[in-house]
């Protein structure tokens, strides 16, 4: 009499079969690890030498509002990695007397990086074979962030630290002279300093004599 084969993912006593859930978990962990490595490498490549930020001789008073905004836009594109680390450092300093809150903040921050900011348009999250919409991911991450701030009772500390960090970044960006800061074409386009089609502009034609 023929026996029915065991269900998929369940081996015999010596089969050592691996269930689909185990394979799925391994795939998710591998994807997150690769994404974390790629994000870290990308952030490192955007960092500029800190001596360029701390160069006091490069600070000057802008001649007007338009020049200050031009400086700010250029410096944010150039120092974006350094500015992000500076703001995070200020937030961490605001939580230095709240170690549990700092741990919660780090976990939430890593979640935002891995599950939202480091993903491109074609990189979707799949759970149990179903694709999760980006709006759901955004809502869930926002909810977790709010709950973390409420239950750790440091929402005011984080808000004040963020405001201080953004004010420092804004002041530095507006007063830092940009004459010695040269952006590559991709960074300039991302910062809105050049039009999207300027890099693909064909060379001007000429008539040989």
UniProtKB/Swiss-Prot annotation:
<dbReference type="GO" id="GO:0010008">
    <property type="term" value="C:endosome membrane"/>
</dbReference>
<keyword id="KW-0967">Endosome</keyword>
<comment type="similarity">
    <text>Belongs to the PRA1 family.</text>
</comment>
<feature type="transmembrane region" description="Helical">
    <location>
        <begin position="155"/>
        <end position="175"/>
    </location>
</feature>
<feature type="compositionally biased region" description="Gly residues">
    <location>
        <begin position="9"/>
        <end position="19"/>
    </location>
</feature>
<dbReference type="GO" id="GO:0005794">
    <property type="term" value="C:Golgi apparatus"/>
</dbReference>
<feature type="transmembrane region" description="Helical">
    <location>
        <begin position="90"/>
        <end position="110"/>
    </location>
</feature>
<dbReference type="InterPro" id="IPR004895">
    <property type="entry name" value="Prenylated_rab_accept_PRA1"/>
</dbReference>
<comment type="subunit">
    <text>Interacts with PRA1B1, PRA1B2, PRA1B3, PRA1B4, PRA1B5 and PRA1B6.</text>
</comment>
<comment type="function">
    <text>May be involved in both secretory and endocytic intracellular trafficking in the endosomal/prevacuolar compartments.</text>
</comment>
<keyword id="KW-0813">Transport</keyword>
<dbReference type="Pfam" id="PF03208">
    <property type="entry name" value="PRA1"/>
</dbReference>
<feature type="region of interest" description="Disordered">
    <location>
        <begin position="1"/>
        <end position="20"/>
    </location>
</feature>
<feature type="transmembrane region" description="Helical">
    <location>
        <begin position="132"/>
        <end position="152"/>
    </location>
</feature>
<dbReference type="GO" id="GO:0005783">
    <property type="term" value="C:endoplasmic reticulum"/>
</dbReference>
<dbReference type="GO" id="GO:0016192">
    <property type="term" value="P:vesicle-mediated transport"/>
</dbReference>
<keyword id="KW-0812">Transmembrane</keyword>
<keyword id="KW-1133">Transmembrane helix</keyword>
<protein>
    <recommendedName>
        <fullName>PRA1 family protein E</fullName>
    </recommendedName>
</protein>
<keyword id="KW-0472">Membrane</keyword>
């Amino acid at each position: 009499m023929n026996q029915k084969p065991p269900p998929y993912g369940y081996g015999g006593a010596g089969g050592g079969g691996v269930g689909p859930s185990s394979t799925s978990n391994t795939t998710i962990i591998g994807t997150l690890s690769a994404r974390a490595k790629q994000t870290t490498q990308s952030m490192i490549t955007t960092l500029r030498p800190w001596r360029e930020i701390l160069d006091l001789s490069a600070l000057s008073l802008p001649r007007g509002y338009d020049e200050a905004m031009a400086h700010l836009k250029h410096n944010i594109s150039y120092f974006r990695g350094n500015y992000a680390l500076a703001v995070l450092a200020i937030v961490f300093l605001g939580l230095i007397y709240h170690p549990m809150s700092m741990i919660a903040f780090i976990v939430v921050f890593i979640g935002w990086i891995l599950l939202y900011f480091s993903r491109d348009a074609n990189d979707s999250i799949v759970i149990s074979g179903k694709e999760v919409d980006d709006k759901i991911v955004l809502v869930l991450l926002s909810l977790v962030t709010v709950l973390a701030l409420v239950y750790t009772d440091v929402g005011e500390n984080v808000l004040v630290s963020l405001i201080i960090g953004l004010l420092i970044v804004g002041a530095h960006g507006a007063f830092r002279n940009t004459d010695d800061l040269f952006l590559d074409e991709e960074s300039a386009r991302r910062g809105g300093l050049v039009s999207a089609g300027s890099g693909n502009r064909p060379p001007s034609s000429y008539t040989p004599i």
